[in-house]
């Protein structure tokens, strides 16, 4: 019997437990390894006996501070020869929003104009260089779940939001207005092992549409253009499992973010068993 281990910071997400259930239905053993457990210690001789690791962790903000602990933990497991799906290079890419934007833009995928900034002066320089108007978006490059993402509507707000930018990995980004009839509706498409599983639109009165913030979903009809876009993103990021977040406008689709550990609640809400698709892929790779 193959064994798959899911790495999770605290195990609060229902997606983690739903995925474990689907893996076990396929006859594989599945453990959830909680990085927050007081019983665990990553020492020099620590080993994790498993056939495959699926990490729900990366570099990110937890409790308003940037932590590298989960990333160092993953790197230590790599030294032991552990196999990961998604690959570690994909985990790093999707954790770093700026690197991700750079890769997409280099490969002719439309993204909002974005800059990595050190301070307020960099932010002003960016606005002037691209002749942008307010509002603009300020976000932390390693933020999660829509947290630490803000809108600056004028220079005073911009100055406040760019304090300590160089220490916090802050980005400034062109604001893409994707509002429809007073509501913001972006898109999340899931790709698993080269197949588009499905997608939904996240509906919000705020430009931050993350489900973590309490927003709702509606089913997305995926046309050929969207399917090709999602598959290209998965190919570029070398991802087996990927959530592709897209801002739709009248004329274009803008890819805003890639997620290598996408939540599956939104898919369950529209009747798609994404956990089963992910579980099938993980079991295949664990057996290979």
Swiss-Prot record:
<keyword id="KW-0479">Metal-binding</keyword>
<comment type="subunit">
    <text>Monomer.</text>
</comment>
<keyword id="KW-0067">ATP-binding</keyword>
<dbReference type="Pfam" id="PF08443">
    <property type="entry name" value="RimK"/>
</dbReference>
<comment type="similarity">
    <text>Belongs to the RimK family. CofF subfamily.</text>
</comment>
<dbReference type="InterPro" id="IPR013815">
    <property type="entry name" value="ATP_grasp_subdomain_1"/>
</dbReference>
<protein>
    <recommendedName>
        <fullName>Coenzyme gamma-F420-2:alpha-L-glutamate ligase</fullName>
        <ecNumber>6.3.2.32</ecNumber>
    </recommendedName>
</protein>
<keyword id="KW-0464">Manganese</keyword>
<feature type="domain" description="ATP-grasp">
    <location>
        <begin position="101"/>
        <end position="287"/>
    </location>
</feature>
<dbReference type="GO" id="GO:0043774">
    <property type="term" value="F:coenzyme F420-2 alpha-glutamyl ligase activity"/>
</dbReference>
<dbReference type="GO" id="GO:0005737">
    <property type="term" value="C:cytoplasm"/>
</dbReference>
<dbReference type="InterPro" id="IPR011761">
    <property type="entry name" value="ATP-grasp"/>
</dbReference>
<feature type="binding site">
    <location>
        <position position="257"/>
    </location>
    <ligand>
        <name>Mn(2+) 2</name>
    </ligand>
</feature>
<feature type="binding site">
    <location>
        <position position="139"/>
    </location>
    <ligand>
        <name>ATP</name>
    </ligand>
</feature>
<feature type="binding site">
    <location>
        <begin position="173"/>
        <end position="186"/>
    </location>
    <ligand>
        <name>ATP</name>
    </ligand>
</feature>
<feature type="binding site">
    <location>
        <position position="259"/>
    </location>
    <ligand>
        <name>Mn(2+) 2</name>
    </ligand>
</feature>
<feature type="binding site">
    <location>
        <position position="202"/>
    </location>
    <ligand>
        <name>ATP</name>
    </ligand>
</feature>
<feature type="binding site">
    <location>
        <position position="257"/>
    </location>
    <ligand>
        <name>Mn(2+) 1</name>
    </ligand>
</feature>
<dbReference type="InterPro" id="IPR004666">
    <property type="entry name" value="Rp_bS6_RimK/Lys_biosynth_LsyX"/>
</dbReference>
<feature type="binding site">
    <location>
        <position position="245"/>
    </location>
    <ligand>
        <name>Mn(2+) 1</name>
    </ligand>
</feature>
<keyword id="KW-0436">Ligase</keyword>
<dbReference type="GO" id="GO:0036211">
    <property type="term" value="P:protein modification process"/>
</dbReference>
<comment type="function">
    <text>Catalyzes the ATP-dependent addition of one alpha-linked L-glutamate molecule to coenzyme gamma-F420-2, producing alpha-F420-3, the major form of coenzyme F420 found in M.jannaschii. Thus, caps the gamma-polyglutamate tail of coenzyme F420 with a terminal alpha-linked glutamate. Prefers ATP to other purine nucleotide triphosphates; GTP gives about 25% of the activity observed with ATP. Cannot catalyze the addition of the following amino acids or analogs: D-glutamate, beta-glutamate, L-aspartate, L-glutamine, L-alpha-aminoadipate, or D,L-2-amino-4-phosphono-butyrate.</text>
</comment>
<keyword id="KW-0547">Nucleotide-binding</keyword>
<comment type="pathway">
    <text>Cofactor biosynthesis; coenzyme F420 biosynthesis.</text>
</comment>
<dbReference type="InterPro" id="IPR031039">
    <property type="entry name" value="F420_CofF"/>
</dbReference>
<dbReference type="GO" id="GO:0005524">
    <property type="term" value="F:ATP binding"/>
</dbReference>
<dbReference type="GO" id="GO:0046872">
    <property type="term" value="F:metal ion binding"/>
</dbReference>
<dbReference type="InterPro" id="IPR013651">
    <property type="entry name" value="ATP-grasp_RimK-type"/>
</dbReference>
